[in-house]
């Protein structure tokens, strides 16, 4: 057994620290991306082009789709023929750690499509479970095998200074690691991520089908500084969830003992839902979660991605689009804050942060 990353001196940097690059996956799963994923592919392309201005983008695309991806992206990315079941690079890619000598270590978690047989979203996830190790191998990075511990990248945020942010709703979900206690889960995170402290938010975003990943509800924008998804509408189920998170964060400190500065980032004013027009576009596998008309989608501006030169922020043709851009522009004065029309990614079940995974410098 290899020593834990913590014992070996590795830690997980913050997303706002310098990147070597970003991992993404071409969207092709018919049960996630309606109408051959045409609209999603346009959105992915805009995201890739924006990120590529400041860092390398690695795109996993199987041979059958390579010429299609090249028709959108040309030579803007590094193409890797690694098989996948879907395009959620945040959740299937490795968590890459660094040490003080600049060496990298890729953590490979078990992936079971957000809940396995208990409440997973699809049952054919064998390729997805291999993405982290195969990608690390392609990069020539050593791998720390954290299996059978189940975790997705969207379930953790790091401040790069010893603090990890998670939600209880996800990490304590019966579909993840039901045989482990909360204390055992926390210890695994600390050892695997080289961290000192885990902060457990009670909730994520209402009806987030990942069991409420933290990356949809809260994110570090600097040391001891966070954004939190918020609504003032007390009739929205999100209100009580965000309020509980805020109350916890206001009492908490980071690993260094600092209190948090918390910026409230409004959720879209208008509920984002699946429409009748969306439904004919999906083709499902057996055992795959199906969409229904009127289903509320877990839309949140917190699902942004911090690239080297830009912050990419979901946009929903909503009155709060600009509000979110303005708040994040103040948080990131040294980066270009770019709004990306994101409903077509949201229809797949996630957003910009869910389809990207940073590779630290």
UniProtKB/Swiss-Prot annotation:
<feature type="active site" description="Amidino-cysteine intermediate">
    <location>
        <position position="354"/>
    </location>
</feature>
<dbReference type="GO" id="GO:0009446">
    <property type="term" value="P:putrescine biosynthetic process"/>
</dbReference>
<dbReference type="InterPro" id="IPR017754">
    <property type="entry name" value="Agmatine_deiminase"/>
</dbReference>
<keyword id="KW-0378">Hydrolase</keyword>
<dbReference type="Pfam" id="PF04371">
    <property type="entry name" value="PAD_porph"/>
</dbReference>
<comment type="similarity">
    <text>Belongs to the agmatine deiminase family.</text>
</comment>
<dbReference type="GO" id="GO:0047632">
    <property type="term" value="F:agmatine deiminase activity"/>
</dbReference>
<dbReference type="GO" id="GO:0004668">
    <property type="term" value="F:protein-arginine deiminase activity"/>
</dbReference>
<dbReference type="InterPro" id="IPR007466">
    <property type="entry name" value="Peptidyl-Arg-deiminase_porph"/>
</dbReference>
<protein>
    <recommendedName>
        <fullName>Putative agmatine deiminase</fullName>
        <ecNumber>3.5.3.12</ecNumber>
    </recommendedName>
</protein>
């Amino acid at each position: 057994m290899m020593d834990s990353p913590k014992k070996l001196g590795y830690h997980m940097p913050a997303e706002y620290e310098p990147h070597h690059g970003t991992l993404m996956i071409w969207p092709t799963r018919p049960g996630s991306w309606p109408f051959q994923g045409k609209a999603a592919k346009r959105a992915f392309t805009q995201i890739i082009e924006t990120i590529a201005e400041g860092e390398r983008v690695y795109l996993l695309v199987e041979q059958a789709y390579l010429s299609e991806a090249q028709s959108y992206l040309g030579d803007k990315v590094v193409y890797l023929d690694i098989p996948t079941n879907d395009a959620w690079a945040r959740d299937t890619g490795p968590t890459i750690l660094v040490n003080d000598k600049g060496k990298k270590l890729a953590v490979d978690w078990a992936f079971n499509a957000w809940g396995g047989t208990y409440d997973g979203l699809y049952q054919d996830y064998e390729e997805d479970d291999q993405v982290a190790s195969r990608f690390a191998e392609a990069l020539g990075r050593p791998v720390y095998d954290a299996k059978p511990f189940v975790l997705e990248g969207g379930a953790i945020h790091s401040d790069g200074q010893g603090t990890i942010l998670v939600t209880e709703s996800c990490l304590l979900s019966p579909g993840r690691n039901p045989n482990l206690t909360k204390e055992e889960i926390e210890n695994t995170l600390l050892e695997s991520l080289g961290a000192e402290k885990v902060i457990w938010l009670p909730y994520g975003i209402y009806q987030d089908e990942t069991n409420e990943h933290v990356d949809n509800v809260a994110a570090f924008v600097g040391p001891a500084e966070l954004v939190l998804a918020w609504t003032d509408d007390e009739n929205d189920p999100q209100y009580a969830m965000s309020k509980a998170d805020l109350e916890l964060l206001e009492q908490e400190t980071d690993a260094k003992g600092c209190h948090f500065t918390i910026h409230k980032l409004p959720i879209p004013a208008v509920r984002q839902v699946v429409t009748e027009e969306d439904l004919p576009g999906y083709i499902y596998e057996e055992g795959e979660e199906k969409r229904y008309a009127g289903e509320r989608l877990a839309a949140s501006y917190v699902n942004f991605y911090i690239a080297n030169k830009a912050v990419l922020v979901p946009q929903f043709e909503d009155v709060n689009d600009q509000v979110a851009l303005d708040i994040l522009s103040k948080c990131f004065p040294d980066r270009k804050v770019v709004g990306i029309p994101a409903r077509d990614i949201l229809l797949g079940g996630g957003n910009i942060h869910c389809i990207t995974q940073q590779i630290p410098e």
